[in-house]
């Protein structure tokens, strides 16, 4: 798959996220995909699905914006921002109603049109501070 098609697949996944279609978002991933950077996510689509279902339950209707996207060979890298309202339990934190903004960076590796590995690093400390679970800096 060309770098242009990989970038297009990422943008399509983002559009699916923003339309509320988790299955459409997850269509980007290979069934044996690996998501690195978040604790407790085992290899494979079932574990990745559970991770995102928990996030969506806590931040329903969240928006995903890709700020920068770069591609080379079979890899796509992007800087992203997730914004939403904390309306469900998140990591044992009851809903706060707080509007959150969580920036991050992800690198995706593609094979045969599917993401096989994703390295994602988001500002989890900043998110927990916004939710009042950690003191502000």
Predicted ranges, named:
Residues 3-8, 22-76, 80-86:
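A solvent-exposed, acidic/Ser-Thr-rich amphipathic alpha-helical stretch
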